[in-house]
Amino acid sequence: MKFELKTTDGRARRGQLVFERGTVQTPAFMPVGTYGTVKGMTPEEVRETGAQILLGNTFHLWLRPGQEVMRAHGDLHDFMNWQGPILTDSGGFQVFSLGHIRKITEAGVHFRHPINGEKIFLDPEKSMEIQYDLGSDIVMIFDECTPYPATYEEARKSMEMSLRWGKRSRDKFDALGNKNALFGIIQGSVYEDLRDVSLDGLLEIGFDGYAVGGLAVGEPKEDMHRILEHVCPKIPADKPRYLMGVGKPEDLVEGVRRGIDMFDCVMPTRNARNGHLFTTDGVVKIRNAKYREDTSTLDADCDCYTCKNYTRSYLYHLDKCNEILGARLNTIHNLRYYQRVMQGLRDAIEQGKLDDFVTEFYRRQGKPVPPLAENDVK
């Protein structure tokens, strides 16, 4: 993988990630394909929304279908018939999400299979092996996602263990002869000095890109913005920056304003299945009875298949009848909306008009523009 930075506007960056499997324009949003599928969508449909890279889930793909099945197909690209780049998370966040049914030690994580109760162990070395079999274009180190809230001491211990796991991940990745990219993950909760220690430790190990982890886990938005404003300028400019698990459309905008290049989130797909649709003028909750006879287009500014062919009334009807097509059409739209936001951000940065884009984005959403830290203002 090669990262090329083309231009900047304030702290926002316009670049591209070059892989053997294709080039990804940044800032980029990665749809989440947990089990080797973006729910309800064919790979061709996902690509038509504008997506150039997907996220796969190491933890879930390890449990089902397993490494043997993946190896029999070649890798995840062949298994799911997506020939573009794929980033896989390490499984750390999913293990963190298991809560009481897992035990974290220095060696790794002991937990019970969430489906059959079988005892399982996952560590940095195993995570690297799984991601090697998946053929991931971007591999993430195995880390502990620090819960929120965490005391300073809890956050420090968690971050330090993640650093040690990061070194083990790097060593195993290299031992496997993996020629793809490996990203480090910056931890430290809401404490700036711990984030600094984490980044310094990761830089010493050396990675192809750096993710900001442990955010969007319940902390106030102000804390997320503060940490991004603190951390992003310290990440080497020639390395891509990835904000994990984020977020709402406005979170993408705010991340880009602060220097983030990559995002992923289940929100556009999960919310679509629940009738929660993102539009240029704000959220449409299509289950609301006021849409029963609404013959207007979902989003007049959108060029997706759904908006070009169907009315809000029809989408309301499909949802009311629990028709599978409803979830599919909603997903097509939400994913296209997210990609249109990213395209708008990329174009604005290229033209040196990011402030204008941000102002118009929030005006249409009916929200005030969140302030940047003083040292972030051009």
Curated annotation (Swiss-Prot):
Its cofactor is Zn(2+). Residues 245-251, 269-273 are annotated as: RNA binding. One of its GO terms (cellular component) is cytosol. It comes from the Bacteria. Binds 1 zinc ion per subunit. Its EC number is 2.4.2.29. It catalyses: 7-aminomethyl-7-carbaguanine + guanosine(34) in tRNA = 7-aminomethyl-7-carbaguanosine(34) in tRNA + guanine. Pathway: tRNA modification; tRNA-queuosine biosynthesis. Zn(2+) binds at C302, C304, C307, H333. Keywords: Glycosyltransferase, Metal-binding, Queuosine biosynthesis, Transferase, tRNA processing, Zinc. It holds the Pfam family TGT. The active site is at D89, D264. Substrate binds at D89, S90, G91, G92, F93, D143, Q187, G214. GO terms for molecular function: metal ion binding; tRNA-guanosine(34) queuine transglycosylase activity. Homodimer. Within each dimer, one monomer is responsible for RNA recognition and catalysis, while the other monomer binds to the replacement base PreQ1. Catalyzes the base-exchange of a guanine (G) residue with the queuine precursor 7-aminomethyl-7-deazaguanine (PreQ1) at position 34 (anticodon wobble position) in tRNAs with GU(N) anticodons (tRNA-Asp, -Asn, -His and -Tyr). Catalysis occurs through a double-displacement mechanism. The nucleophile active site attacks the C1' of nucleotide 34 to detach the guanine base from the RNA, forming a covalent enzyme-RNA intermediate. The proton acceptor active site deprotonates the incoming PreQ1, allowing a nucleophilic attack on the C1' of the ribose to form the product. Belongs to the queuine tRNA-ribosyltransferase family. This is Queuine tRNA-ribosyltransferase. It comes from Aeromonas hydrophila subsp. hydrophila (strain ATCC 7966 / DSM 30187 / BCRC 13018 / CCUG 14551 / JCM 1027 / KCTC 2358 / NCIMB 9240 / NCTC 8049). The gene is tgt.
